[in-house]
């Protein structure tokens, strides 16, 4: 089964390196796998100011963050392939990649996979859930040719 993906990438900030729409599509398809036959998803790339505003509004944390996931929840009687939205802060991803000694491409891929797993219902609040999510992230990231994102450098 191949995923029929409708992906809208919104570049709301500039940066030295931003992944292409094709890269985003590959990472999303890898993360979603066979979970759905069709999916519609928006990825919005933002600056630190917009990330901080959204993080403050929706999570009560007054600072920019790497990725925010906004799952779409349709009423029970309506079936739509809308997965939701990811908002990724380019500046935070770049800083984290540098601090963690990772390539920008690898860290972008990790943030997309991580965000998509949240949209699919995975979480990392409880230790057991975190282990399951991190294990799946690692498998998916390694399948893309990158190293374990949680391995200490």
Swiss-Prot record:
One biological process term from GO is:
rRNA processing
Tell whether Hydrolase is among the UniProt keywords: yes
* Location in the cell: Cytoplasm
Cofactor(s) the protein needs: Zn(2+)
EC number(s) on file = 3.1.-.-
- InterPro entries from the UniProt entry: MetalPrtase_cat_dom_sf_prd, YbeY, YbeY_CS
Q: What's a Pfam family in this record? A: YbeY
A Gene Ontology MF term for this entry?
zinc ion binding
Concerning SUPFAM superfamilies, the annotation shows: Metalloproteases ('zincins'), catalytic domain
PROSITE patterns membership: UPF0054
Q: What is its main location?
A: cytoplasm
Q: Where are the transmembrane segments?
A: none
Cofactor, free-text remark: Binds 1 zinc ion.
Name the residues that bind Zn(2+). 114, 118, 124
> What is the recorded function of this protein according to its Swiss-Prot or TrEMBL entry?
Single strand-specific metallo-endoribonuclease involved in late-stage 70S ribosome quality control and in maturation of the 3' terminus of the 16S rRNA.
Under the heading PANTHER family, the entry gives:
ENDORIBONUCLEASE YBEY, CHLOROPLASTIC (PTHR46986:SF1)
Query: Know the name of this protein?
Result: Endoribonuclease YbeY
Recorded source organism is: Shewanella sp. (strain ANA-3)
